[in-house]
Amino acid sequence: MLESRDLTKKFGSKVAVNRMTLRLEPGHVYGMLGPNGSGKTTWMKMAAGLMKPTEGEVWFDGEKVGLNSRARVAYMSTEPYFYAWMTPALAGKYYRDFFRDFSMERFEKQLESMQLDKNMKITAMSTGMAAKLKIAITMARDADVWMLDEPFNGIDLLARDAIRDSILSSMREDKILLLSSHLVEEMEAIADQAVFIRQGNLIETRDVKEMLEAGTTLADRYREIYAGMEGA
């Protein structure tokens, strides 16, 4: 279980995340939703142990997030993090040297399912191809928690189905998968739990299936929560 307790992050006078208490349980796919600037990335970086909170704590399986727990979390950022001269094959070897839980076999299967050439130079890749490579690298780790920040950015509509299948094929009952996005329709197709964040505050966590059975789509609820907000 991954849990934040009154987690807060301030940048000067700006409060990016405000006293967020959130619990993520194994066996679930969480979709963290909110417009750009709502605090999704900041919360994820703190939960992954990559950013120090101003206040509050993050706990993972009964201990505070630190070096031990950080090794069990695979976080995919929105920023590119490959050397331009690399190919996917070289990038895989590079990550294998850094992470003991990285599987080249799993990585190559991810590349195949996403139709990526492992010998293609990264400099020759489109934005969408580079985005797919980031997902493949992250999901090739046998982590306890996967966090994918805006995984569908830059990926065309036709490629998203294959990417969803590739991501979900890695899920198991003992894993936690968290994806952040402002693409609501994509989250409805992949997440079973929806986490709504507005201006750094946790609004609610909802069961997606129960919402749909009650006649409310994620898009409906998104509009209700974020109507009138700039960038929503």
Give the positions of each predicted feature.
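ABC-family P-loop ATPase nucleotide-binding domains
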Residues: 78-134
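Catalytic Walker B motif of ABC-type/P-loop ATPase nucleotide-binding domains
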Residues: 146-150
